[in-house]
């Protein structure tokens, strides 16, 4: 039988209606997104591969879409699949001609770029003004939040024709920033069919699709045409295919299967029959912008119906019916802390002034608690102050001790153990002397006061030698014990007769089971009834406030909705349904404060009730939409409040949780698949030896140059010490006619294996870094005595340099140095390297305009999963260290920020000593009290506030090095505004440049072929005519990547040249080496491509401070600091800060090598080093009490000593 035409049409309509739903239910591939902004990840190739891995086949970006540093001819076709971005879209610093975001429909703008923009397209061009030409985002129809910015895109076509008011919300139009500078005549015009000439590119397919400004007045949001019947549902975003909420292209708020909704279905509904809230079988949890029936794994459920990663501070996590839920805590939430002798208290004898703060809010102690006499006396050996008796109140939250409680000292003015009044159970899993779980010995208390103690699970009790203690013999201890074998030992306390004579007996309301003190609240149990913890004579059943009922000899308060009765009972039990009479209204069997109004009921209907004259709640008429004041339609309220929508902030937070969850899930799944395939392949090849455990950490591809001893020449001894000797010398690469001034560090013949290991570790760190502002290792010679070869630095360390030239240093130099040091430290942070010893003495001066960070003797490389380094001992620079490093030996990149702040202070005070006159042993205490280094006289408050931020106690509150670069770079552009130096504009520093300088420095005559090490390792094109014949040459990629631009330019002499690195000898004497070249610097004829990450190239007016450019100035004939080079034990700095020495804190070095600092500044861990103290206290003592070794009064570097021991046995 053939179906009729009507039935066939109905079937087709049904199928058409189901198609959008099926499409909406499809699972789209999501990706995490990035938050790098303008940071480049390695080389251009590495950066592009990272971009491709992140967004390949991605349809929904949960974070931000950042397309940066993409070079010409790279294929970006993988971006075509992206349809939705939750954060912002950033397209910047690209030279590729086309970025195909053809299917991008919506940008939600949950996160902004520069606090304003959801779409930013910036500086997409190269030196030839060519670059991004096509941006075909033809399906982009809505930006929910945020404005749009276009700037410096000289080759971009057609975008200026877009009607942004159709895409961007009207509230953000005022923040739009449109700077279109397209002067190219090669752009194709929009297709004539495009509305109002608006298009994203040539061709009819690139015409802008209008879904807002063309809508009829009846439409409240988007539309698909000009007719009133073409309006989209108000829950739709970016357009629609029909009028229903299931026809949306994208949901504006939440997606519940195929339907867009304002909120997810609630978990609970009001039941008008039972007058209770019942579980909604259709209820769902909100997870990001999606409604889900079940929260993803590792998420917990809140009472509000949301999937969250962790419970709030006032709730705890528990499992109920197979679901992990957050439940409100009754009182303080449970917090488990380690006891004495465990974890962070492993070597601690007693609770004291320094560790009691760690027990704040603890409810359970995992281990034991000791309170010994040393706690209240203090310990001068460990610099522990006496414990303030008021701080014992911190222990009032403790309810459980899994080990034992030992108290041998207590404040004289306290009559009981008040700090343990809430202690409920002592489990006795560990015991003092293997016997006692509770020991109270030799105290001045009159009562125990352990009024909450209900159980001592194991172990005996000893209460002895308390001359004023009463009440202890009244306790029925057997009732508290968990086993029959437990015993008590209560001796040598105050006699029972003496206690009775002074009235120190249990209260009359206490039962014969005894008491913990004289008050009614101290009773073990009550004679009559109890109210809370206190025994009372009777309950407030017939009179008194609040009214109560009796349950198990306990007074229980009636519900607040029960009306108190006169000489009659008010309630018969707990809850609002056991009241004799209601105080306000009656809703079924329950007493309520107000009748239900707008409560969600069955079938998603709202329940409204009104109260009659008898205060009984009745249902409103079904047609009353906004409540009522009486029965029938005439009682309906005309206007009512609208249901509040979910806050935008909650949506953003849930989306962020979704990003994190999906990102982790995708990462774990991908890693599992790769590992499984690898194991399968190896098993098939029958070559599997052991399971593979790839770490995922990037390989260290640094190059280590091995030199022959014949390739370098030692000229002069710089100094010697316990580890070896440092020489000035020349490196003459084999087969090349160049001479490179170097420093050579040679170990002694009898050097220990430990010293060899330390110098090789230092070489590993130096070889792993390559930055203009970080010292580099030139090579290593593996002779019988290991030799390190590093670059020779002409001007020594920055500390001595600022001291010697303090009358000639202007604000420009000081701020430039701050920028360069921050750049070097930011590079080390990117390489996961913690320096641990940043100071002005460890910064070397290559030229007055160029400084480098050195001394990696204490530096540590963090692993892929490490965020901090825990030191085990050794020498440390106390006055430069962060507080957490001093107290806990924790070193992070943020502890380096603290040291950076001290280094800046040294520069701004022209080499003053930090905390001068204060012993190093007192530094931690004055820092904890809030004292910091004073404001230098030349610094404005702007500069000083940056230093103060570096010295915040909370490490996360300190600025990042990348932020410090931005701040000091801004100041370096206007130096006299931030530093006030008299005669600043006339100050300049000598800067010799020719080979005469090296000739004088090296005492050599034949220095015509001298070449700086940086120029040799990364030479300019055509610099050397003959190739190197060394057997260990640098890879060609080093020189190939030294310049990112291939565009030719003409220098001032008319010779062909290329853009130069900021530490190049061609730019050595620029007035501001920290900044980029400007267009004015080469007569506006050429703008070089930035060589470094985030190098800005804006054109700005010249500052008022001008630094001279030096050319061939004569060398100073007799440098004043030359004797320091000859004498490593010079006493140039008076009143030395370091122990057992008169050596200076910094000797003028001439090369960027940690080896030289180890010799001159003594930063290696050796016995003859004044700057680093191995142990502040000696480990042994002679029988006469005199310590072996030297003592310290003002050590800059010290090590935490073990605590003293004091213990009195029971």
Swiss-Prot record:
InterPro entries: Furin-like_Cys-rich_dom, Furin_repeat, GF_recep_IV, Growth_fac_rcpt_cys_sf, Kinase-like_dom_sf, Prot_kinase_dom, Protein_kinase_ATP_BS, Rcpt_L-dom. The record marks 1016 as: Important for interaction with PIK3C2B. Residues 25-645 are extracellular. It is found in: Cell membrane; Endoplasmic reticulum membrane; Golgi apparatus membrane; Nucleus membrane. Residues 1-24 form the signal peptide. Keywords: ATP-binding, Cell membrane, Disulfide bond, Endoplasmic reticulum, Endosome, Glycoprotein, Golgi apparatus, Hydroxylation, Isopeptide bond, Kinase, Lipoprotein, Membrane, Methylation, Nucleotide-binding, Nucleus, Palmitate, Phosphoprotein, Receptor, Repeat, Signal, Transferase, Transmembrane, Transmembrane helix, Tyrosine-protein kinase, Ubl conjugation. GO terms for cellular component: basal plasma membrane; cytoplasm; endoplasmic reticulum membrane; endosome; endosome membrane; Golgi membrane; nuclear membrane; nucleus. The modification Phosphothreonine is found at residues 678, 693, 1041. The modification Phosphotyrosine is found at residues 869, 998, 1016, 1069, 1092, 1110, 1172, 1197. Residues 688-704 are annotated as: Important for dimerization, phosphorylation and activation. Gene3D superfamilies: Hormone Receptor, Insulin-like Growth Factor Receptor 1, Chain A, domain 2, Immunoglobulin FC, subunit C, Phosphorylase Kinase, domain 1, Receptor L-domain, Transferase(Phosphotransferase) domain 1. Residues 1097-1137 are annotated as: Disordered. It is a single-pass type I membrane protein. Approximate repeats lie at residues 75-300, 390-600. Residues 1104-1115, 1128-1137 have a biased composition (Polar residues). Phosphorylated on Tyr residues in response to EGF. Phosphorylation at Ser-695 is partial and occurs only if Thr-693 is phosphorylated. Phosphorylation at Thr-678 and Thr-693 by PRKD1 inhibits EGF-induced MAPK8/JNK1 activation. Dephosphorylation by PTPRJ prevents endocytosis and stabilizes the receptor at the plasma membrane. Autophosphorylation at Tyr-1197 is stimulated by methylation at Arg-1199 and enhances interaction with PTPN6. Autophosphorylation at Tyr-1092 and/or Tyr-1110 recruits STAT3. Dephosphorylated by PTPN1 and PTPN2. Monoubiquitinated and polyubiquitinated upon EGF stimulation; which does not affect tyrosine kinase activity or signaling capacity but may play a role in lysosomal targeting. Polyubiquitin linkage is mainly through 'Lys-63', but linkage through 'Lys-48', 'Lys-11' and 'Lys-29' also occurs. Deubiquitination by OTUD7B prevents degradation. Ubiquitinated by RNF115 and RNF126. Ubiquitinated by ZNRF1 or CBL at different lysines in response to EGF stimulation; leading to recruitment of the ESCRT machinery and subsequent degradation in the lysosomes. The modification N6-(2-hydroxyisobutyryl)lysine is found at residue 745. ATP binds at residues 718-726, 745, 790-791, 855. The modification Phosphoserine is found at residues 229, 695, 991, 995, 1026, 1039, 1042, 1064, 1070-1071, 1081, 1166. Residues 712-979 form the Protein kinase domain. Residues 669-1210 are cytoplasmic. Belongs to the protein kinase superfamily. Tyr protein kinase family. EGF receptor subfamily. Receptor tyrosine kinase binding ligands of the EGF family and activating several signaling cascades to convert extracellular cues into appropriate cellular responses. Known ligands include EGF, TGFA/TGF-alpha, AREG, epigen/EPGN, BTC/betacellulin, epiregulin/EREG and HBEGF/heparin-binding EGF. Ligand binding triggers receptor homo- and/or heterodimerization and autophosphorylation on key cytoplasmic residues. The phosphorylated receptor recruits adapter proteins like GRB2 which in turn activates complex downstream signaling cascades. This is Epidermal growth factor receptor. The gene is EGFR.
């Amino acid at each position: 039988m053939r179906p009729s035409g009507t039935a066939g049409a109905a079937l087709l309509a049904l199928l058409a209606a189901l198609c959008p739903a099926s499409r909406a239910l499809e699972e789209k591939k999501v990706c995490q997104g990035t938050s790098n902004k303008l940071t480049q990840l390695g080389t251009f190739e590495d950066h592009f591969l990272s971009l491709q891995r992140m967004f390949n086949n991605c349809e929904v970006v949960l974070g931000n879409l950042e397309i940066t540093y993409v070079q010409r001819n790279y294929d970006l076709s993988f971006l075509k699949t992206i349809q939705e971005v939750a954060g912002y879209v950033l397209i910047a610093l690209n030279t590729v001609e086309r970025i195909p975001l053809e299917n991008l429909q919506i940008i939600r703008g949950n996160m902004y770029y520069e606090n304003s923009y959801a779409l930013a397209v910036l500086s997409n061009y190269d030196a030839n003004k060519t670059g991004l030409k096509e941006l075909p985002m033809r399906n982009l129809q809505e930006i929910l939040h945020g404005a749009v910015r276009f700037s410096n895109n000289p080759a971009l076509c057609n975008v200026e024709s877009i009607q942004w008011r159709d895409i961007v919300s009207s509230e953000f139009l005022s923040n739009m920033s449109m700077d279109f500078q397209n002067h190219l005549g090669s752009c194709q015009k929009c297709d004539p069919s495009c509305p109002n000439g608006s298009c994203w590119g040539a061709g009819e397919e690139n015409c802008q699709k209008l879904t807002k400004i063309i809508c009829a007045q009846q439409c409240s949001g988007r539309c698909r045409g000009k007719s009133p019947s073409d309006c989209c549902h108000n829950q739709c975003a970016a357009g629609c295919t029909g009028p229903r909420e299931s026809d949306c292209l994208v949901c504006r708020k939440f997606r519940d299967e195929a339907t867009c909704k304002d909120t997810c279905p609630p978990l609970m509904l009001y039941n008008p029959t039972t007058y209770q809230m019942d579980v909604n079988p259709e209820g769902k949890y909100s997870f990001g912008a999606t409604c889900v029936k079940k929260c993803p794994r590792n998420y917990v459920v809140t009472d509000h119906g949301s999937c969250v990663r962790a419970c709030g501070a006032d709730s705890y996590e528990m499992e109920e019916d197979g679901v992990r839920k957050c439940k409100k805590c009754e009182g303080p939430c449970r917090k488990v802390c380690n006891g004495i002798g465990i974890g962070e208290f492993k070597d601690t004898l007693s609770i004291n002034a320094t560790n009691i703060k760690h027990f704040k809010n603890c409810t359970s102690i995992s281990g034991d608690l000791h309170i010994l006499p040393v706690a209240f006396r203090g310990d001068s050996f460990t610099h522990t102050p006496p414990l303030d008796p008021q701080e014992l109140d911190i222990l009032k939250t403790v309810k459980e001790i899994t080990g034992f409680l030992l108290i041998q000292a207590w404040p004289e003015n306290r009559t009981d153990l008040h700090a343990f009044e809430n202690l409920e159970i002592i489990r006795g899993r560990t015991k003092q002397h293997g016997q006692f779980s509770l020991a109270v010995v030799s105290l001045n208390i009159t009562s125990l006061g352990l009024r909450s103690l209900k159980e001592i699970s194991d172990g005996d009790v000893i209460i002895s030698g308390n001359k004023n203690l009463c009440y202890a013999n009244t306790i029925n201890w057997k009732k508290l014990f968990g086993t029959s074998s437990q015993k008590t030992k209560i001796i040598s306390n105050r006699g029972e007769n003496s206690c009775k004579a002074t009235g120190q007996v249990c209260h009359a309301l206490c039962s014969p089971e005894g008491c913990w003190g004289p008050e009614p609240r101290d009773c073990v149990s009550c004679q009559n009834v109890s109210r809370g913890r206190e025994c009372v004579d009777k309950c407030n059943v017939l009179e008194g406030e609040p009214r109560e009922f009796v349950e198990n000899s306990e007074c229980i308060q009636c519900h607040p909705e029960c009306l108190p009765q006169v000489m009659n009972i008010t309630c018969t039990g707990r809850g609002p349904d056991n009241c004799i009479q209601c105080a306000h209204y009656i809703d079924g069997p329950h007493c309520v404060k107000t009748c239900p109004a707008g409560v969600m009921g069955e079938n998603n209907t709202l329940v409204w009730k009104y109260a009659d004259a008898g205060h009984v709640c009745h249902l409103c008429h079904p047609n009353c939409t906004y409540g009522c004041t009486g029965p029938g339609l005439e009682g309906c309220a005309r206007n009512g409040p609208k249901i509040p929508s979910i806050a935008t902030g909650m949506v953003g937070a849930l989306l962020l949780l979704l990003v994190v969850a999906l990102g982790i899930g995708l990462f774990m799944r991908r890693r599992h698949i790769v590992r499984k395939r690898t194991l399968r392949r190896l098993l098939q090849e029958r070559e599997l030896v052991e399971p593979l455990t790839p770490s995922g950490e990037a390989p260290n591809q640094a190059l280590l140059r091995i030199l022959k001893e014949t390739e370098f020449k030692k000229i002069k001894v710089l100094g010697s010490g316990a580890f070896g000797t440092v020489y000035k010398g020349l490196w003459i690469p084999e087969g090349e006619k160049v001479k490179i001034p170097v420093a050579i560090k040679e170990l002694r013949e009898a050097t220990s294996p430990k010293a060899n290991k330390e110098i090789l570790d230092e070489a590993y760190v130096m070889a792993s870094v390559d930055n203009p502002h970080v010292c580099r290792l030139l090579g290593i010679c593996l002779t019988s005595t290991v030799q390190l070869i590093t670059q020779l630095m002409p001007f020594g360390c920055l500390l001595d340099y600022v001291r010697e030239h303090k009358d000639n240093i202007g604000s420009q130099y000081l701020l430039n140095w701050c920028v360069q040091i921050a750049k070097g430290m930011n590079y080390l942070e990117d390489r996961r390297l913690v320096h641990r010893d940043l100071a002005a003495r460890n910064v070397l001066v290559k030229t007055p305009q160029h400084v480098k960070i050195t001394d990696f003797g204490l530096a540590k490389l963090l692993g892929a999963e490490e965020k901090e380094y825990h030191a085990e001992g050794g020498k440390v620079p106390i006055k430069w260290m962060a507080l957490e490093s001093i107290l806990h030996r924790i070193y992070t990149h943020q502890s380096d920020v603290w040291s950076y702040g001290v280094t800046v202070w040294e520069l701004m005070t022209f080499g003053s000593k930090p905390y001068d006159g204060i012993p190093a042993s007192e530094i931690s205490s004055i820092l904890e009290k809030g004292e910091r280094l004073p404001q230098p006289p030349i610094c404005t408050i702007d500069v000083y506030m940056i230093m103060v931020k570096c010295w915040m106690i909370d490490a996360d509150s300190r600025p990042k090095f990348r932020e410090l670069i931005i701040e000091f770079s801004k100041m370096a552009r206007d130096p006299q505004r931030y530093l006030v130096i008299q005669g600043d504009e006339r100050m300049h520093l000598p800067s010799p440049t020719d080979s005469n300088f090296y000739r004088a420095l090296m005492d050599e005559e034949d220095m015509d072929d001298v070449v700086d090490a940086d120029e040799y390792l990364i030479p300019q094109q055509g610099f050397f005519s003959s190739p190197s014949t060394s057997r260990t040459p640098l890879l060609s990629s080093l020189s190939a990547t030294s310049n990112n631009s291939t565009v030719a330019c003409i220098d001032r002499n008319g010779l062909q040249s290329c853009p130069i690195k900021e530490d190049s000898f061609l730019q050595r004497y620029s007035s501001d080496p920290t900044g980029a070249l400007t267009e004015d610097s080469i007569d506006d004829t050429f703008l070089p491509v930035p060589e470094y990450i985030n190098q800005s190239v804006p054109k700005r007016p010249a500052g008022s401070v001008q630094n001279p450019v030096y050319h061939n100035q004569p060398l100073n004939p007799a440098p004043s600091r030359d004797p320091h080079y000859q004498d490593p034990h010079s006493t140039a700095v008076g009143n030395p800060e370091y122990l057992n020495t008169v050596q200076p804190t910094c000797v003028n070095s001439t090369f960027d090598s940690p080896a030289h600092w180890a010799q001159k500044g003594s930063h290696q861990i050796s016995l003859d080093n004044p700057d680093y103290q191995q142990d502040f206290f000696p480990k042994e003592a002679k029988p006469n009490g005199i310590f072996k070794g030297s003592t310290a009064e003002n050590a800059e570097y010290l090590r935490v000593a073990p605590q003293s021991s004091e213990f009195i046995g029971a």
